[in-house]
Amino acid sequence: MGVPKKRTSSMRRDRRRAANFKLKPVNVVKCPKCKEPVLPHRACPSCGTYKGEQITEAS
């Protein structure tokens, strides 16, 4: 078995781990009523609807 000759520094270890950490882009859909961009599974901030029902007042 191979054994490391030198200890891996914390900076090198963290840099290697950070290379694989990537944020996923935000999934944005259009509101079926007002066609504004909305995050999925949330009420529309512009018209206040969620799943076709009026939840909050329009802002």
Swiss-Prot record:
This is Large ribosomal subunit protein bL32. Belongs to the bacterial ribosomal protein bL32 family. The keyword tRNA processing does not apply. Keywords: Ribonucleoprotein, Ribosomal protein. HAMAP family: Ribosomal_bL32 (MF_00340). GO terms for cellular component: large ribosomal subunit. Pfam families: Ribosomal_L32p (PF01783). The keyword Ribosomal protein applies. The gene is rpmF. GO terms for molecular function: structural constituent of ribosome. One of its GO terms (biological process) is translation.
